[in-house]
Amino acid sequence: HIVAAGGKRIRPMLTLSSAKLCGYKGDRHLALAACVEFIHTATLLHDDVVDTSILRRGESSANLLFGNQASVLVGDFLFSRAFQMMVEDGSLDVLRILSHASSVIAEGEVLQLTTVNNTETGENIYLEVIKSKTAQLFAAACEVGAVIAKRPAIEQRALETYGINLGITFQLVDDVLDYTAKQRNLGKTIGDDFKEGKVSLPVILAFSRGTSEERQFWRRTLESLDQTDTDLEYAIKLMSKHDALSDAIKRARHYGSIARDSLGIFDDNPIRSSLVGLIDFCIERAN
């Protein structure tokens, strides 16, 4: 079910591409790319249990089909198998990077629990959540490619910077898509986050710029989850009124620019061009 569910496989691609960008000639990057995808898939399985989600990538989620117990246990297995493969690789640096990323992801999950149904969540906390939950694994996926190629620290840091800012860009756009995309493009129905009471940047901006009456709307729909059939449409109108969606995209472009600049120390070649193109892909998803 997990394999058939598909996905963009961006994270393992980052490991493969980063290794190639750094001139790596071996095959260790293949298993490490799999480790990265195992970690990511494990977090998705656990996420869907925590969020009681019923869809993942436009299809029924694993927890809906097989139950919470199976989803948690398979997620645990994938985490365990990833660490087993890291140990088999034999690099303490790789183990340090990916174990740190796994720990930060878990911290981000806990931090996000404090923001659900909390309209007072600030932009700084939101950014900390997406850095931890999403961007940290992007960064680790890139960094291990440079590590196994034995590149100098400056190149490792450059790829880490690229990954963290690409991850932020990706998540910012993803949160915009929850209010704008068609199911076939996003892999979930529009308004999933709204219905679950998740507070993302478009909500934060619309809430902070809104009138007292509008803020009461957000409190009712997101904090109390007292929602009617027309509330999602009204929420999108408020976001448009206060430029919340367009400003979130501007933030995404800002972080995308940082990611692009971080690749400047590498020679221009097809791999680097692909990594730059990935930034554009993440942003253009909003269109």
Residue ranges and their predicted role:
Residues H1-N287:
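All-alpha prenyltransferase/terpene-synthase fold signal
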